[in-house]
Regions:
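Conserved HGGG/HGGXW glycine-rich cap/lid loop of the alpha/beta-hydrolase fold
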Residues: 1-42
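The conserved beta1-alpha1 loop
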Residues: 8-10, 73, 183-184
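Active-site loop/oxyanion-hole signature of alpha/beta-hydrolase fold enzymes
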Residues: 31-69, 225
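Gly/Ala-rich beta-loop-alpha elbow adjacent to hydrolase catalytic centers
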Residues: 72-76, 80
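Flexible "cap/lid" loop of the alpha/beta hydrolase fold
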Residues: 85-86, 91-122
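Conserved alpha/beta-hydrolase catalytic His-Asp/Glu region
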Residues: 106, 123-174
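Conserved loop-alpha-helix segment in the C-terminal half of the alpha/beta-hydrolase fold
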Residues: 179-212, 217
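Catalytic active-site module of serine/aspartate enzymes centered on a nucleophile-bearing elbow/loop
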Residues: 203-240
Length: 240
């Protein structure tokens, strides 16, 4: 199985969300790269743009010895698909989790209004964010993984504006590498998962029972098993 895996985190969290997967993949001998996106984690305070987000993934993949398997969660999944659609270099595969709905402008603008209101709270929404995380992810260890690298409170407006430039069906249709779409059965953002699957050239849809939007943390063991199986399938298909 050894090779490289790039793990791209979601909105407002950071590379810390991947602790469980990093430990599992490292134990199997993989090189694991977990970049922080602009405005998140160690890059808190930077402005987020779609171009800089894509460049972050490109730099992470370039730094890793091949074959490289790319994984993205939510925001990271949208960015990974967008990047892979334009990427001339071969990758082993891509797993896009919890990004099963096209980010239409109307939806994004509604979220921007809501995010703006929350940002007016005295703590800019930190308490609300952490309360929601701990309510959705009952295991305190995994809930802490979400927030351990810092909570990106100031990046919402930039991200929701920039996501207008992502066209998931178009992106998925242009990716030659195998694609896995992984969603929790309780995820509210999987409305178009079948359309997205139909758009892929070589795609697999996996639903993890009982998992919410934060699938890799709500069901970490099950998610990691799916991820390892996906990586192994690409390794076995690669000519010696």
């Amino acid at each position: 199985m050894p090779g490289s895996v790039v793990l791209v985190h979601g909105l407002r969290t950071s590379a810390s969300m991947w602790r469980h997967q990093v430990e599992a993949l490292t134990a199997l001998g993989c090189t694991v790269v977990t970049p922080d996106l602009p405005g998140h984690g160690a890059r808190m305070g930077e402005r987020f743009t779609l171009a800089d987000g894509v460049a972050t993934i490109d730099e992470a993949v370039s730094s890793a010895p091949g074959p490289v398997f790319v994984v993205g969660f939510s925001l990271g999944g949208y960015l990974a698909a967008h990047w892979a659609a334009e990427e001339p270099r071969a990758i082993a595969g891509i797993l896009a989790a919890s990004c099963g709905t096209q980010p239409h402008r109307v939806i994004l603008d509604a979220w921007r209004v809501g995010a703006g209101a929350i940002h007016l709270l005295p703590d800019r929404g930190l308490g609300l964010n952490n309360a929601v995380v701990r309510a959705v992810i009952r295991d305190p260890v995994y809930a802490n993984d979400v927030i351990a690298g810092g909570v990106a409170l100031d990046v919402m407006q930039d991200v929701l504006r920039e996501l207008r430039g992502v066209r998931m069906e178009r992106a998925l249709s242009r990716i030659d590498a195998p694609v896995w779409l992984v969603n929790g059965t309780l995820d509210h953002i999987r409305l178009q998962e079948r359309r997205f699957l139909a758009a892929t050239r070589n795609g697999t849809l996996v639903r993890i029972p009982g998992a919410t939007h934060m699938v890799s943390l709500a069901r970490p063991v099950e998610f990691t098993r799916v991820l390892i199986d996906a990586i192994n399938s690409t390794r076995s298909a690669t000519p010696a």
